[in-house]
Amino acid sequence: MTGRVAIVTGGTGALGQSVTSRFLSAGATVWIPYVVPAEVEALKARVGAGASLHCAHADVTDETAFGRFVQSVLDAHGRVDILINGVGGFAGGDLVSTRLVEWDRMLTLNLRSAVIGCRGVLPAMTAAGFGRIVNISSRAVVPPLGGFIGYTVAKAAIITLTQALAREVARGVSVNAVLPSTMDTPANRQAMPDADRSGWVSTDAVAEVIGYLASDAAGMVSGATIPV
């Protein structure tokens, strides 16, 4: 991954920090769009603030804002090699009790952000003849679980997006998805203090799978949906 240029959306979150650390350690340059400055400081406290890490304010659910962000990356490096669509959100609720505004929020955070991300980088990747896109779905959608239907539907759509887009992209560009089970994060520990965490997966373990899919070695893997 030495010399590769990566965009990691959601890079200030728990999984995003692990992915960013993994990529920086492998020699990549990482660009992260953010909206909360304090989260950037937390990221830098973990991975450092070296010359290979770039953070710029951009809302990835706003196509115009993300387009400007991508152009900044292209202006600096001339290419975007890797996109990790790591932005997402969770909310519980069944079909009847989930308000439409919450449906919209789940679709915006989990699906719209990924669509905008892919649309933003694909022209440059296609022109270069190289690209790695990794989307984040969830094991909760295979098979779909009830009780948090807005989240489930949005993450299931990520699988369809991944598989369909893998058939649309040019040679040299791959599109894959990882499906984490419950991740061991501070937020999940707080939300489920009495849960059995023996089956939870670490964010570093998920980042290792993402790292492989983003690597040059994974060029023949596309359209895969990998549970972790």
Model-derived regions: residue spans:
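C-terminal helical subdomain
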Residues: A170-V173, A177-V178, T185, A195-V228
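Active-site helix of classical SDR
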Residues: C118, A154
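Residue(s) in the substrate-gating loop at a strand-loop-helix junction
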Residues: S138
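Conserved glycine-rich cofactor-binding loop
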Residues: T12-G13
